[in-house]
């Protein structure tokens, strides 16, 4: 069963490969994403993050989810030498980590419900589990210069995939060390990681590093990356190609 809804300002697709899955099972996942949006959306006046930014809550009043995200954000800032930073212009915006974290929590929900073969895609960040019809999941990496074109097809099982770039949302990632300088040397960076939370946070940080980001990913155990720069040149990590499905243009 496969369903799509527009939530958190993006399309979210949930596909579960199991004859016993019901619409209620999938709706619980979408309900969870709605709750996450109600907590962390900086566009909603009454969200918890908006109240935090207005100084209406003290730390003791933060929800457990807020405390978790803020702690994970600080951990990521330290692990990336400050290239991941949720504070900008005196405001806190954890969107660079919330999406991957929420997808992973949704995946845990499906596993706890007894499902082992599924796919969750929220705005291009993806968690897959098990397989589809006995084969690994196939995930396409789009050409940032021509969105209808697939440049690589990945074959993955039990992995997270996250892409950071400027093709869809424009300039929304910045280098915290030079916040007023637009990132123009790369346009897309796709990361394969042990789960989508890990892939998402490091994709955001590595993109902020510019062309050096792919070398940061190379040094991370358990991660692979594929970068496309502003000249349409691709650079990828040493183990990336083992996930590439050769001579096949079909994709999810």
Which role fits each region the language model picked out?
Residues 1-252:
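Mature catalytic core of soluble alpha/beta enzymes
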């Amino acid at each position: 069963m496969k369903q799509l809804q527009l939530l958190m300002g993006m399309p979210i697709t949930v596909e579960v490969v199991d004859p016993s899955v019901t619409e209620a099972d999938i709706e619980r996942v979408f309900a969870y994403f709605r709750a996450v949006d109600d907590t962390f959306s900086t566009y909603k006046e009454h969200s918890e993050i908006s109240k935090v930014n207005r100084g209406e809550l003290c730390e003791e009043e933060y929800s457990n989810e807020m405390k978790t995200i803020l702690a994970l954000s600080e951990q990521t800032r330290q692990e990336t030498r400050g290239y991941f930073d949720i504070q900008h212009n005196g405001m806190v915006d954890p969107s660079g980590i919330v999406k991957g974290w929420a997808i992973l929590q949704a995946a845990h929900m499906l596993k706890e419900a007894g499902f082992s073969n599924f796919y969750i895609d929220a705005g291009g960040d993806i968690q897959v589990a098990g397989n589809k019809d006995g084969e690994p999941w196939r995930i396409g990496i789009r050409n940032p210069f021509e969105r209808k074109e697939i440049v690589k097809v990945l074959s993955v099982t039990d992995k997270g995939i996250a892409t950071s770039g400027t093709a869809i949302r424009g300039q929304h990632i910045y280098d915290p060390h030079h916040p007023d300088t637009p990132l123009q040397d790369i346009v897309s960076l796709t990361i394969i990681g042990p789960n989508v939370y890990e892939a998402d946070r490091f994709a955001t940080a590595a993109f902020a590093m510019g062309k050096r980001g792919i070398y940061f990913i190379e040094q991370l155990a358990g991660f692979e990356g594929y970068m496309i720069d502003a000249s349409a040149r691709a650079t990828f990590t040493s183990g990336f190609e083992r996930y590439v499905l050769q001579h096949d243009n079909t994709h999810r």
